[in-house]
Amino acid sequence: SDLLEKNLSEILTKITWKKSMKWANYDLYWGRPLKSILAIFNKKPLNFVFNHINSSNKTFIDKSLEEGLKIFNNFNSYIKFFKQKGILIDQDLRKKIIQNKINEIINKKNLKIEQNDRLIDEIVNIVEKPAVIICDFDKKFLNVPSEILITTMQSHQKYLPTFDKKNNLTNNFFVVSDIKDTKGFVKLGNERVIEARLSDAEFFWEKNKTQNL
């Protein structure tokens, strides 16, 4: 623990972000505003200073879960607390849940998805309590080249397109949400979003076809 306390501050300074921010009167640039640093090792708090923050066994809890500071005495209690709130700390577990649900649906619908580990990993890291939803878009958009549709879904929206057994793109796609879609609102909202995106893609594709090379 002494070694960790001595080196953690320096290690944190070496973390870089594509985009950083500065807030209040602090000198620290970070991906998001830091309010606390929770650091525990062998059931004991680690004590070090990073910029303007002292580490401790306390952390702020999102107000949607529980107001104020929360004390954790070990990592297991940390995992247990968030699991009770429906949040899965273990990213490997989140990934497994997402993949299992997708496999369950594609087997039922006789579909398949393209293996895209980078996109899956990105999705895993932007959800806390993953809910997999299968959506669809108007089949008329399948007249647009599949490369354009796939790029629109994957790059812009972080959706997972589906294919039939002959590797043809279908009008079904997967959304991984942080909200259970009990009333179908998440599905409807994402279908509206992709409708707008694909309408734009279709417009520019048709426009480009009129241009001579």
Model-derived features: positions:
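Long, basic N-terminal domains or extensions that often function
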Residues: 1-158, 163-167
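Function-dense linear segments that define catalytic or interfacial modules
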Residues: 161-213
